[in-house]
Amino acid sequence: VGWDFTFMDGIRDRNTGIWKNISIYATGKVALRHPFIKSELRKPDYGQARETVSVEVINSSTSNSGINCKVKGEIVGENISFEKSFRVIRGEQKLVTFSPEEFPQLVMNSPRLWWPVNKGPQNLYDLKLTVSVDGVICDSVKTRFGIREITSDTKTPDKSRVFYVNGKRLFIRGTNWIPEAMLRHSDERTYAELRYTRQSGVNLLRMWGGGIAESDYFFQLCDELGLLVWQEFWMTGDTRHPHDKALYMSNVESTVKRIRNHPSLAYYVASNESTEMTGTPELLNQLDGTRGYQMQSECAGVHDGSPYKQVNPMQHYENTASPRGSRVDGFNPEYGAPTLPTVEILREMMDEKDLWPINKEVWDYLDGNGFHLMTTMYTDLVNHYGKSSSIDEFAQKGQLLGAINSKSIWEVWNYNKLDYGDRFCSGLLFWYHNCSMRQVASRMWDWSLEPTASLYHTANSLEPLHAQFDYLKNTVSVVNDFYRSFDNYKVTAQVYDINSRKVFEESAVVNLPADGVANDALTIRFPDGIS
């Protein structure tokens, strides 16, 4: 299985060809590769960081017995510099390390920490390294990094996995990311999709195991936007392990070396619903050692996903949306629903004659062979708003359905955040939020980057201070995503009838705990006979 598994046709030759930029450049007698800076933060105040810097020095010459060289480094703008002289023999690839024990200047007091969205600033530093021979610089590298610690454990009431950033618990409100179908990743598209992602309010992106490791620019933007990344390694439960283990492990190594300096990179997972390749955890510990790891997406405190399709929104509140049983609990890696694209996008996808009346064969083809039941279940739910007489009317009502489902999903998880709700919930990864190609089962936006109502209602539900209504209990709760408390705040609920006459109003004073929820702050009493 690949990233195209829910599409109408598989992507031909998807495992061949060049899909990233290739650069050719010249260096002097020696070259630098794969710089890495590792932070160790002092507990419990996180007021000191011990930095360990390493870089590979390569002498690719075959015509000399050895070269005396010097590597110099600096953390730009921090008055921190260091250097080391050594010899590299011909053909040697030497790992040169600068430790805080050897270089006390690499102990940073009061470091500016990096935080995910809503939790603090996205502070970043620059590391610059040069290598010289006889005073002449042969090569230089520069990398950006952030100082932070991300850990996780299963010390929770239900043994579900909970994440921590710089020692503080982090409620995960994340999504699954699927790569563009033909891997046509321009910087402009990447920026647009991550800008939408940040606008939505989510704090983590799962690089689903059937996909890829995204571009350097993708990770750069995640660093700047405060978006965490859960990186999986290209295996799923629907397929066998790679035939060429050495090639697979080489891919893991090159990928980790490429992305490990990014503070947004939070977690490694070997596969989607499968098992790991033997030796993977040992390799990750050798190459990185600063991030958590699990062998597949549904283990170690992360249960299996669902639902994947539209349901009556009340089922999210009742916790009956999944045929597999309770899924609003613990850490769910895949829970979501599609949203119909706008009518303009639908007209770009198919002929008018297939739009209305709905041509089931064509629509199912554009729904991954009917995977999301857009012509049956989704259509039935849209019809709850009344029968439609045109595709324009149907598409508009389809936005209403997508909006209420997205809002219901996020707000149910808000209510049950960590210790505050009826059940302990540590994280949700919405399945999925971006579209890899044109499909009638759209998400927060379509492949052509046209937003749906799902984006705006997700953004509303995930605003850092958010008042929300529980359709099952008729209560109003207030959710706080900041690491600070808010006392003596007033929440007001008003009810209007169909003629815009206010028929109910009530207020309550709430004290919002840091990163907490004031659940059921007030109850709405609907007047009898309201319409």
List each language-model region with its residue ranges.
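Secreted/periplasmic carbohydrate-active enzymes, especially glycoside hydrolases
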Residues: V1-W208, A213, Y415, D419-C425, ...
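Active-site mouth of glycoside hydrolases
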Residues: I11-R12, K155-D304
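A generic "alpha-helical surface" signal
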Residues: N123, Y164, E188, A246, ...
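Active-site region of glycoside hydrolase catalytic domains
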Residues: R33-P35, D139, E253-W363
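A general secondary-structure junction signal
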Residues: E149, S297, Y432-N434
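Substrate-binding clefts and catalytic carboxylate motifs of secreted carbohydrate-active enzymes
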Residues: W3-T6, D13-G17, I24, V30, ...
